[in-house]
């Protein structure tokens, strides 16, 4: 599959690049995508949730009423889970949600996500670029020139670029990632994926 190469002014350079079929043209594997996204989301969790059990509630331990003869249910102290303000039974406890995923599955998931974007014609390739200084205005102009300003945007760079990152940081729906940090969730969450020529070459080395 061939796509045109544009510059940041939105002009067609007259050159074309070929998207690797083994990355951008495979039959997407939805289960691999599910597993990779599940792992990504789980690993973002802090896992600090906590509720108090009966023994952790600060309150009197005096028995509310007599055990028998009251005509109602048996009750212990005010910390009982059946009463408002009492402890919680089997409530959440701090835990680590982190889990690992096989490298082959993660690679397949990223290939599948990129293939979905290629099928939707949602991949734009641009010449390598750099900003002289962090300027949000310059980044916005680039998105308008490429006609992607109205979409969620994922810009993939070959390596970290502070000026580009800072220029996009304050723009809603815009995300800048390096090729090493590319993940399935970010790709699927974007309406359009913008790849530089160097990023496209680097993807071949990482995902093949």
Swiss-Prot record:
Keyword Isomerase applies: no
GO cellular component, one term: ribonucleoprotein complex
SUPFAM superfamilies recorded: Ribosomal protein L4
Name assigned to this protein: Large ribosomal subunit protein uL4
Keyword vocabulary terms for this entry: Ribonucleoprotein, Ribosomal protein, RNA-binding, rRNA-binding
Pfam families: Ribosomal_L4 (PF00573)
Role this protein plays: One of the primary rRNA binding proteins, this protein initially binds near the 5'-end of the 23S rRNA. It is important during the early stages of 50S assembly. It makes multiple contacts with different domains of the 23S rRNA in the assembled 50S subunit and ribosome. Forms part of the polypeptide exit tunnel.
Species for this entry: Bacteroides fragilis (strain ATCC 25285 / DSM 2151 / CCUG 4856 / JCM 11019 / LMG 10263 / NCTC 9343 / Onslow / VPI 2553 / EN-2)
GO-annotated biological processes: translation
Quaternary assembly: Part of the 50S ribosomal subunit.
Record-stated family: Belongs to the universal ribosomal protein uL4 family.
Region (Disordered) location: 44-79
HAMAP family: Ribosomal_uL4_B
Gene Ontology molecular function: rRNA binding; structural constituent of ribosome
